[in-house]
């Protein structure tokens, strides 16, 4: 849990000619809501797979791309976030704009919710297995956006999400959040498992990086981050 120097919540809207997105996030979990849904009657019977409400978290992901919903759900769950994501995108073209813009909007929301990097560990790493797959993620809340994502995916698609867009989502998130992120899938033969273990490993790393370090200091020799 992030030190209680603020609510660590954000509400972000991103509207372009390609996508319309709104995101509500609380990095410490708890109750969140959005002013008004943009999805409405566009919800379908398959919706609800990436929806979860517990005493500590509210998660509701609707991007229009099922496997992307699944990955963002895993990221939020294991990061300890409460997260609502709604997107209406130009999926009649392909999944590129929706996936990329959701990554950008989520990164922006994370950055706004985090605020000044103070009193946290700054660095975090995590390993996550999923059956035969094992992934490692290393994070720096650096204000220096850079990512190296090596998932080794072989399939063209998982569900309705192009495999090339899976690392690109993580790259887009990293850039907007202004993080340094390295994610590597170390082993595994099932691309679903490889991808999911990578998102879970990133969640573990983010949770550690944003956890208290026992001070109220900025964890940098520069004296400022973000």
From Swiss-Prot:
One of its GO terms (molecular function) is imidazoleglycerol-phosphate dehydratase activity. InterPro entries: IGPD_sf, ImidazoleglycerolP_deHydtase, ImidazoleglycerP_deHydtase_CS, Ribosomal_Su5_D2-typ_SF. It is an enzyme of class 4 (lyase). It catalyses: D-erythro-1-(imidazol-4-yl)glycerol 3-phosphate = 3-(imidazol-4-yl)-2-oxopropyl phosphate + H2O. Pathway: Amino-acid biosynthesis; L-histidine biosynthesis; L-histidine from 5-phospho-alpha-D-ribose 1-diphosphate: step 6/9. CDD domains: IGPD (cd07914). Its EC number is 4.2.1.19. Keywords: Amino-acid biosynthesis, Histidine biosynthesis, Lyase. The keyword Magnesium does not apply. The keyword Amino-acid biosynthesis applies. Belongs to the imidazoleglycerol-phosphate dehydratase family. NCBIfam families: PRK00951.2-4. PANTHER family: IMIDAZOLEGLYCEROL-PHOSPHATE DEHYDRATASE, IMIDAZOLEGLYCEROL-PHOSPHATE DEHYDRATASE HIS7. This is Imidazoleglycerol-phosphate dehydratase.
